[in-house]
Regions:
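Short alpha-helical segment of the dimerization/phosphotransfer core of two-component systems
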Residues: 44-49
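Conserved micro-motifs of the catalytic ATP-binding
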Residues: 64-69, 109-112
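A conserved beta-strand-to-alpha-helix junction within the catalytic ATP-binding
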Residues: 70-88
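Short helix-loop "hinge" at the ATP-lid/N-box region of the Bergerat-fold HATPase_c
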Residues: 128-129
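Acidic ATP/Mg2+-coordinating residue in the GHKL
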Residues: 156
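Short conserved segment of the HATPase_c
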Residues: 161-175
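Conserved glycine-rich
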Residues: 202-203
Length: 233
């Protein structure tokens, strides 16, 4: 199943790249505007392949517990402000409304790998974008204080997930509605990577969803305290 998924997900952008490259070589793209459009499409499809290869490389490290974490003290407010600003630019271009609420004190810290937590957020948001099917789409991000932890909530109003699929969405290679996933791409390991990263941070991740209404992903990470174990620094 994995090999079949990878073959399909690589073949789709490769076919597009070849087609548009041939269009340029054969003179079908006979205006500067067409050439620009073709080159941009080739670039975007190459990016899709690069993301898939990076995901598979990370998966191989996960499979052997070799993720290279770089833990550091992170200010929650500053960090998530930066993440949301970056996400917002991409969502704006896709005409998806983004809202953000931070209910955590400005001095709260966590011990985390900033690159890997950013990967978690980007994977979840990217998944939401894939399955948007409404004219007025939105993604809401909320950061809440829940005692010894911060809780991150990422809500969308996309297609949602069938309740029969919910117990398996974080399993490796699992694809809810395989035909739909084949159309949108993806290796089926994105959420399993997210789960592994959060658990390696001592946290927990879960989701709620209603088919037709959307999905909310939740994850928690423990706050930094002076007395906590600092072995990960």
């Amino acid at each position: 199943m994995l090999i079949s998924n990878i073959a399909h997900d690589l073949k789709t952008p490769i076919t597009a790249v070849k087609g548009y490259a041939e269009g340029i070589l054969d003179g079908v793209a006979n205006t500067p505007e067409k050439v620009d459009k073709y080159v941009r499409t080739i670039y975007n499809k190459a990016n899709d392949m690069d993301k898939l290869i990076n995901e598979l490389t990370l998966y191989s490290k996960i499979d052997t517990n070799r993720i290279p974490y770089n833990f550091a003290k992170i200010n929650v407010t500053d960090y998530f402000n930066d993440c949301v600003e970056e996400i917002g630019l991409d969502l704006e271009a896709k005409n998806i409304r983004l809202s953000y609420e931070n209910h955590v004190d400005s001095n709260v810290l966590i011990i985390a790998d900033p690159e890997q937590i950013r990967r978690v957020i980007n994977n979840i948001v990217g998944n939401s974008v894939k399955y948007m099917n409404k004219t007025q789409s939105y993604i809401d991000i909320r950061i809440n204080d829940v005692g010894d932890f911060i809780q991150v909530e990422i809500e969308d109003n996309g297609r949602g997930i069938d309740q029969r699929d919910m117990p398996y969405i974080f399993d490796r290679f699992y694809r809810a509605d395989a035909s739909r996933n084949s159309a949108t791409g993806g290796s089926g390991i994105g959420l399993s990577i997210v789960k592994k990263i959060i658990e390696d941070h001592g946290g927990k991740i879960w989701a709620t969803s209603k088919e037709g209404d959307g999905t909310t992903m939740f994850f928690v990470i423990r706050k930094y305290q002076e007395t906590q174990d600092m072995n990960r620094q």
